[in-house]
Amino acid sequence: KVGDFVYLFTNKGILYNETTYKGDKEKIIPLVNDEKIPSGCIYVQNHANSEFIAVSVNVKKPTEIVDQMMVMNASVNVYMGTDAIYLYSTEYKKEKAYTNITKFQYNDGYMSGVASKTVKGEITDVFAISESNNILRVLTTEWDEQSKNRLYMLDDKMQILGKLSGIADGEEIYAARYIGNIAYFITYHNTDPLFAVDISDPETPKVIGELKITGFSDYLHPYGK
């Protein structure tokens, strides 16, 4: 819920017989409030095997739909920022993982597409993606002969402002948090390293601290200062 508006997200996998259906196309368009989603509100992406539907409702008029959209894509995760909705999914090309991110703006219940971006690696923790001051911060792990970790800083048009790589190569990001202008994340090893990255300048993120923590960690939680 943002202000007077509630945003509802649903996701449904597409069955094989639906992808080969040759009958009346109108019969397979999902319904919102017993009405078909308008064609102008449907986005189709590559490798579509699921239907993501977003609906907004004004709590002062709960029986009316303010806006709706359907995105045909791969199975997605959702991150909701202060004024944008981000859908992200993993795609494999030649045995390498990539993350596709699509941005939709929202305001007073209305939603519209902005841009998409593909970055190397996979988002391995729900807290590894975060938006602040119109900057999207994304931590990924790429598996290859030796795994690689990267931090991407994307502007409001989904263009890469800055990038940090070469962080704990050979390991995988297990947990992440963004607190103020610092990105914290833990990579997996017998002794888990905790990294702190200064992201105050989105064009030049830099590692400012590293701490070895004995044991296994897959969650970071902020506690005061």
Report each predicted region and the residues it spans:
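Beta-sheet-rich non-transmembrane sensory/scaffold domains
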Residues: 1-225
